[in-house]
A protein has these predicted regions:
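Non-transmembrane alpha-helical segments in soluble domains
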Residues: 9, 44, 90, 109-116, ...
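Extracytoplasmic "Venus flytrap"/periplasmic binding protein-like
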Residues: 1-59, 91-96, 100-103, 193-195, ...
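Glycine-centered hinge/linker elements that transmit conformational signals in sensory
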Residues: 112-114, 154-186
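Extracytoplasmic/periplasmic solute-binding protein
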Residues: 68-79, 84, 109-158, 201
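Solvent-exposed loop/turn segments at secondary-structure junctions
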Residues: 2-3, 25-30, 82-85, 92-93, ...
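Structural recognition of the beta-strand scaffold that forms the well-ordered cores
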Residues: 19-23, 75-78, 85-87, 122-125, ...
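Hinge/lid segment of periplasmic solute-binding proteins
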Residues: 27-84, 103, 109, 135-137, ...
Length: 236
């Protein structure tokens, strides 16, 4: 992903840019911001220019808007968008007497000790920059960078330290780790997916791309939206 982004930028500077470039989701804000600089032609703009009929409403709103500018016009074409999901091991939940999968972090905190007492890891996640940074800001409707998240200008700084909700969340993660409610097994994606796949953890935050492989090894699990802080969203 990073190599392709760098190669695309280098090719443009050399005057030998490709007609199209598949850019990963983390680079979307950069591409959207470059429309105003004349580097990128937005998808909807190009479709209108060449008389191509496009109904942007055919896309799931959350995915469409991720690749759109601040006016809601699609700049990129969602091709194989990865979605962050919470996987739940229903056998573990049944064993410890939990009937409902939590929707909020507050609900998770209420059941985490019960899971830990049974000898399981309550929660794992596989990619903090995506799951507990990018998706955290998005799910809680918070700005992650200046420049209106890159929609109005190329971002010059992140707003991590200035965002009280984000600081609170990571303080909670530290607390969960110390209590044994959150497991961290290494930087690699598979380091944290493997304990869930092996039946050692109740919940795992990962990608929709793992669903097919998971079905072949874990008999009883569900996929759910990632958790959110009710105290931040007001239940929305």
């Amino acid at each position: 992903y990073e190599d392709n982004m760098a190669a695309t930028i280098a090719a443009f500077r050399a005057g030998d840019q490709p007609h199209y470039s598949q850019v990963y989701d983390a680079g979307a804000a950069i591409m959207v911001a470059q429309v105003k600089n004349g580097v990128v032609i937005g998808f909807e703009e190009m479709a209108e220019k060449y008389g191509i009929s496009v109904d942007a409403d055919n896309y799931i709103p959350g995915i469409k808007n991720f690749y759109a500018d601040s006016d809601g016009k699609m700049v990129g074409v969602p091709f194989n968008s990865s979605t962050c999901l919470m996987y739940a091991n229903m056998d573990i939940l049944a064993e410890v007497g939990i009937e409902e999968v939590p929707k909020t972090y507050e609900e998770f905190e209420a059941i985490a000790q019960k899971i830990a007492d049974a000898g399981y890891i309550p929660l794992l996640q596989s990619h903090s920059p995506w799951i507990w940074t990018e998706n955290f800001f998005s799910r809680h409707n918070l700005l992650m960078t200046d420049g209106n998240n890159g929609y109005d200008a190329v971002p010059t700084k992140t707003l991590f330290a200035e965002t009280d909700e984000f600081v609170m969340h990571w303080s909670k993660v530290k607390e969960w780790y110390e209590k044994g409610w959150y497991g961290y097994k290494g930087r690699a994606w598979g380091d944290n997916q493997a304990p869930f796949t092996n039946g050692e953890a109740a919940f795992w935050f990962g990608s929709a791309a793992s669903f097919g492989g998971m079905k072949g090894v874990l008999p009883n699990f569900t996929t759910n939206p990632i958790l959110y802080w009710d105290s931040v969203t007001g239940g929305k």
